[in-house]
From Swiss-Prot:
GO terms for biological process: cobalamin biosynthetic process. It holds the Pfam family CobS. Joins adenosylcobinamide-GDP and alpha-ribazole to generate adenosylcobalamin (Ado-cobalamin). Also synthesizes adenosylcobalamin 5'-phosphate from adenosylcobinamide-GDP and alpha-ribazole 5'-phosphate. The keyword Repressor does not apply. It catalyses: alpha-ribazole + adenosylcob(III)inamide-GDP = adenosylcob(III)alamin + GMP + H(+); alpha-ribazole 5'-phosphate + adenosylcob(III)inamide-GDP = adenosylcob(III)alamin 5'-phosphate + GMP + H(+). Its EC number is 2.7.8.26. Signal peptide: none annotated. InterPro entries: CobS (IPR003805). Its main location: membrane. This is Adenosylcobinamide-GDP ribazoletransferase. The chain crosses the membrane at residues 10-30, 43-63, 113-133, 141-161, 183-203, 205-225, 243-263.
Length: 264
């Protein structure tokens, strides 16, 4: 029982870190718990995706699909405070030009939005909107399943990067020091377990094995790209690059899912 309560505490810590949702007072906080909470990132993603799916379904009863998709995306941005989108913009600004590692890290710490960051945000969010619109228009139920699945599985990717790459910045002055520490094998296994459970749930709800395979391959391909890109350019990861990886892999999930239902 104590172990289950502790895991619930870790989930709430992750939920509090990544969303605006208030958590019970008994949850508490320590840097060690914050670090260990990484195993539950996909579960937080499933919760966010569930909200997105609910908003999409409700909005589609009242407005055209394009408006419903926009409101669904806006709901997730509000719910998470644009946490991952901010990381995407900073990463695009830092790595968009041919600058040195040190210069890239300095640019990524700048709170101002540059041209590469703006282009990255518009490109990724625009493609997500188009993919979700086409998927919803093709099969609304598949779109709802895909939303929850993509939000969950894409959040397993930052956990993998925490395990596979070293921290590229100054760990002592990191905004979230626990994120500057490597995740254990057990933590990564737990996160991947949540991702596997998301796949099983999606299949049980009607997603085909072919569609899931297409979406999963998209996520894996983008995750592998991020690992290689971050290692070459920065020698590791930063908090911003983790957010960028989540956004890119979420987009890859939608595109893969759409390809799966389109060609099946």
């Amino acid at each position: 029982m104590a172990a289950l309560i502790h895991e619930a505490r870790l989930f709430f810590i992750a939920l509090q870190f990544f969303t605006r949702v208030p958590v019970p007072a008994w949850v508490g906080y320590t840097p060690e718990w914050m670090h260990a909470s990484a195993r539950h990132y996909p579960l937080v993603g499933a919760w966010v995706g569930g909200v997105a799916a609910l908003v999409l379904w409700l909005a589609a009863q009242v407005w055209p699909l394009s408006v419903a998709v926009g409101l669904s995306m806006a709901a997730t941005v509000w719910l998470t405070g644009g946490f991952h989108e901010d990381g995407l913009a900073d990463t695009c600004d830092g790595l968009g030009g041919s600058v040195s590692r040190e210069r890239a890290l300095t640019i990524m710490k700048d709170s101002r939005l540059g041209s590469y960051g703006a282009l990255g945000l518009v490109g990724v969010l625009g493609l997500k909107a188009v993919a979700l619109y086409e998927l919803t228009d093709f099969d609304g139920v598949q779109a709802l399943i895909a939303l929850v699945w993509a939000h969950a599985v894409s959040r397993a990717v930052p956990v993998a990067l925490l395990r596979l790459l070293p921290y590229a910045g100054d760990a002592e002055h990191a905004k979230a020091k626990p994120m500057a520490q490597q995740v254990s094998d057990a933590g990564l296994a737990a996160a991947l377990g949540w991702a596997a459970l998301a796949c099983a749930a999606a299949w049980g709800l009607g997603a085909s094995a072919f569609t899931l395979a297409c979406a999963a391959l998209g996520v894996i391909a983008l995750a592998a790209f991020c690992v290689r890109w971050y290692r070459q350019r920065l020698g590791g990861y930063t908090g911003d690059t983790l957010g960028a990886a989540q956004q890119l892999c979420e987009l890859a999930a939608y595109l893969g899912w759409l390809a799966g239902v389109w060609f099946e």
